[in-house]
Amino acid sequence: MSSIAAWGDGRRTRIGVLGGSFNPVHDGHLQLARRALRHLRLDQVWLMISPGYPLKPVQGMAPFDVRLASVAARFDGRRLVATDIERRLGTRYTVDTLGLLRLRFPHAAFVWLMGADGLADLARWRDWRRIVSLVPFAVLPRPTYNPGALRGEAAVALARWRRPARQAPILADCAPCAWAFLPAPQIGISATELRASALRQRSRHPTHKHTTHQE
């Protein structure tokens, strides 16, 4: 895991920010991060583990340090970087986190990354219009979510700022509220499904100890 200074620095790099609970981390996260690096021509993707995810229940959430270590073990720490910076910033909501990142890394070009499921839920996020006014963002497809996400409240409200996928390489250079829906194979795996699968295995074999990845 690479330590990113919470007080910031003067780096002039193109950085994708992929936040989430990572409970657990899975191949879909890795695929999304790699595709973002390639399609958006980023220098790094920060996998930002959330101390507490407001839209997800606390029950079943692995401890933060376990999730952080699990993510760090899956990514190279150079271009794909697991980070606890949100915990060190002391923020709870994305709008506050992105605001501080812009303030403390004033020369970095940030792109916020999400799956289509995130776009579908975006209008439920605190100050979501403020979020998209802070940095451009990129959306990657997720099975069953794509049509609803693109017809949802946030996507409709932001339709005039949507860039064609061919402009994805310059998205980091665009002013907010620019966004793009990236072309990519759809990522079907989800943390929810992995947790449910692990629970089913434990229920079938109650006396057998299972080791599962935690994010």
Curated annotation (Swiss-Prot):
Catalytic activity of the protein: nicotinate beta-D-ribonucleotide + ATP + H(+) = deamido-NAD(+) + diphosphate
InterPro entries on file: Cyt_trans-like, NadD/NMNAT, Rossmann-like_a/b/a_fold
CDD domains xref list: NMNAT
Single Gene Ontology BP annotation: NAD biosynthetic process
Catalytic activity, EC: 2.7.7.18
Keyword ATP-binding: yes
Assigned keywords, A-Z: ATP-binding, NAD, Nucleotide-binding, Nucleotidyltransferase, Pyridine nucleotide biosynthesis, Transferase
Signal sequence range: none
UniProt entry tagged with the keyword Nucleotidyltransferase: yes
Pathway in which the depicted protein is active: Cofactor biosynthesis; NAD(+) biosynthesis; deamido-NAD(+) from nicotinate D-ribonucleotide: step 1/1
Pfam families: CTP_transf_like (PF01467)
GO molecular function: ATP binding; nicotinate-nucleotide adenylyltransferase activity
Family in the record: Belongs to the NadD family.
Function (record text): Catalyzes the reversible adenylation of nicotinate mononucleotide (NaMN) to nicotinic acid adenine dinucleotide (NaAD).
HAMAP family: NaMN_adenylyltr
Listed NCBIfam families: PRK00071.2-2
Name of the protein: Probable nicotinate-nucleotide adenylyltransferase
Species this protein is from: Gluconacetobacter diazotrophicus (strain ATCC 49037 / DSM 5601 / CCUG 37298 / CIP 103539 / LMG 7603 / PAl5)
Taxon lineage: Bacteria, Pseudomonadati, Pseudomonadota, Alphaproteobacteria, Acetobacterales
Gene: nadD
